[in-house]
């Protein structure tokens, strides 16, 4: 576990954080430019010293200003991936990977190289690599130092769209397979949804919220960040069963099931999905024959009147699902808070 309880004055920015990060998974540090995201991970790495407080990683104290303890950066067992790859141009890819490598067997080396898809690049030099390839090598180099935590500072920000898509696939795989925590700085909603398990929401140096990605996404405090013309709901649901003949997977939603296109996940494994309100309609009675597979019972908990539509929040087995209907439909059907209804979900996006 990573414990951060620090204060730091950085010019006009007063950074303050008090969070505990579990020992696995991706914790995204999210916010606008200048909100203190990079400064927070630099405090963890030792590139910046706090004015007050402490940082502890597992059973080690990285810094404690009260007792004047501070481990040098090179002794903190931290892997750091910057926005730019920062590879040594005079070393091959293999040479870059082996630089700083500690206590790593050949089998582990081969595993990391295969995980990042860079086996065919080992004899090449950085000058001949694409931006995405350079970042994969930089990630591999960081992992091969045998770190207790991996810090990533917007590793996709300098890449064009095709390279971002390419690297994202490897990051998704990486986040599921390595057994150390990852602190991932980003201001991208797409990266947040696809990679993060938890989110630290920062604004003006202060941690505004810290929770699971689905709770942060669905909370009112996050609404201004989404900037959508419609509502959306993010749910993390366990796999209930697979239906191979139809290539479908059922996710457990309390006593009900949410069907999605088949995913390569084991029963019990959680899958993150996003449901947009434009893909949801509301009915009073469950139809007997319909092509829509996802029809779930719930209770209306919130109604918001917009310029050209009405948004309704329906609580389904403890999960809020938004639906958008026309004002005409609302005037005719008179939906009300507390009313039992069914939601028809036409599409579900798997993150």
Swiss-Prot record:
<dbReference type="GO" id="GO:0016887">
    <property type="term" value="F:ATP hydrolysis activity"/>
</dbReference>
<keyword id="KW-0547">Nucleotide-binding</keyword>
<dbReference type="Pfam" id="PF03459">
    <property type="entry name" value="TOBE"/>
</dbReference>
<dbReference type="GO" id="GO:0015412">
    <property type="term" value="F:ABC-type molybdate transporter activity"/>
</dbReference>
<keyword id="KW-0997">Cell inner membrane</keyword>
<dbReference type="InterPro" id="IPR003439">
    <property type="entry name" value="ABC_transporter-like_ATP-bd"/>
</dbReference>
<dbReference type="InterPro" id="IPR005116">
    <property type="entry name" value="Transp-assoc_OB_typ1"/>
</dbReference>
<dbReference type="InterPro" id="IPR004606">
    <property type="entry name" value="Mop_domain"/>
</dbReference>
<feature type="domain" description="Mop">
    <location>
        <begin position="289"/>
        <end position="351"/>
    </location>
</feature>
<dbReference type="InterPro" id="IPR017871">
    <property type="entry name" value="ABC_transporter-like_CS"/>
</dbReference>
<dbReference type="InterPro" id="IPR011868">
    <property type="entry name" value="ModC_ABC_ATP-bd"/>
</dbReference>
<comment type="function">
    <text>Part of the ABC transporter complex ModABC involved in molybdenum import. Responsible for energy coupling to the transport system.</text>
</comment>
<dbReference type="InterPro" id="IPR008995">
    <property type="entry name" value="Mo/tungstate-bd_C_term_dom"/>
</dbReference>
<comment type="subunit">
    <text>The complex is composed of two ATP-binding proteins (ModC), two transmembrane proteins (ModB) and a solute-binding protein (ModA).</text>
</comment>
<protein>
    <recommendedName>
        <fullName>Molybdenum import ATP-binding protein ModC</fullName>
        <ecNumber>7.3.2.5</ecNumber>
    </recommendedName>
</protein>
<keyword id="KW-0500">Molybdenum</keyword>
<dbReference type="InterPro" id="IPR050334">
    <property type="entry name" value="Molybdenum_import_ModC"/>
</dbReference>
<keyword id="KW-0813">Transport</keyword>
<keyword id="KW-1278">Translocase</keyword>
<dbReference type="GO" id="GO:0005886">
    <property type="term" value="C:plasma membrane"/>
</dbReference>
<keyword id="KW-0472">Membrane</keyword>
<dbReference type="GO" id="GO:0005524">
    <property type="term" value="F:ATP binding"/>
</dbReference>
<feature type="domain" description="ABC transporter">
    <location>
        <begin position="1"/>
        <end position="229"/>
    </location>
</feature>
<dbReference type="InterPro" id="IPR003593">
    <property type="entry name" value="AAA+_ATPase"/>
</dbReference>
<dbReference type="InterPro" id="IPR027417">
    <property type="entry name" value="P-loop_NTPase"/>
</dbReference>
<comment type="similarity">
    <text>Belongs to the ABC transporter superfamily. Molybdate importer (TC 3.A.1.8) family.</text>
</comment>
<keyword id="KW-0067">ATP-binding</keyword>
<dbReference type="Pfam" id="PF00005">
    <property type="entry name" value="ABC_tran"/>
</dbReference>
<keyword id="KW-1003">Cell membrane</keyword>
<feature type="binding site">
    <location>
        <begin position="31"/>
        <end position="38"/>
    </location>
    <ligand>
        <name>ATP</name>
    </ligand>
</feature>
């Amino acid at each position: 576990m990573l414990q951060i309880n620090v204060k730091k004055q950085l010019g006009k920015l007063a950074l303050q954080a008090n969070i505990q990060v579990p020992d696995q998974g991706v914790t995204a540090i999210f916010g606008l430019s200048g909100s203190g995201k990079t400064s927070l991970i630099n405090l963890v790495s030792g590139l910046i010293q706090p004015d007050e407080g402490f940082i502890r990683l597992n059973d080690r104290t990285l810094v404690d200003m009260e007792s004047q303890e501070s481990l040098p950066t090179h002794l903190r067992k931290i892997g750091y991936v910057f926005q730019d790859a920062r590879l040594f141009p005079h070393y091959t890819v293999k040479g870059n990977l082996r630089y700083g490598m500690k206590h790593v067997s050949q089998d582990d080396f081969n595993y990391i190289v295969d995980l990042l898809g860079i086996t065919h690049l080992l004899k090449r030099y950085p000058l001949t690599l694409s931006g995405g390839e350079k970042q994969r090598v930089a990630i591999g180099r960081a992992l091969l130092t045998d770190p207790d935590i991996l810090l990533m500072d917007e590793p996709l920000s300098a890449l064009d769209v095709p390279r971002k898509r390419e690297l994202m696939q490897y990051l998704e795989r990486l986040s599921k397979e390595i057994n150390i925590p990852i602190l991932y700085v980003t201001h991208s909603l797409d990266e947040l949804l696809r990679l993060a398990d938890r989110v630290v929401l920062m604004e003006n140096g202060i941690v505004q919220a810290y929770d699971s990605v689905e709770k942060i996404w669905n909370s009112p405090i996050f609404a201004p960040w989404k900037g959508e013309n419609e509502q959306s709901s993010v749910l993390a649901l366990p796999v209930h069963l697979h239906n191979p003949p139809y290539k479908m997977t059922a996710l457990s939603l309390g006593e009900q099931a949410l069907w999605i296109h088949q995913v390569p996940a084991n029963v019990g494994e959680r899958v993150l999905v996003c449901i947009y309100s434009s893909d949801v309609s509301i009915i009073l009675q469950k139809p007997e024959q319909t092509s829509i597979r996802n029809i779930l019972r719930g209770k209306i908990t919130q109604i918001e009147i917009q310029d050209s539509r009405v948004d309704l929040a329906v609580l389904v087995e403890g999960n809020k699902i938004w639906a958008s209907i026309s004002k005409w439909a609302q005037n005719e059907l008179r939906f009300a808070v507390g009313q039992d209804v069914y939601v028809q979900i036409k599409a579900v996006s798997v993150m």
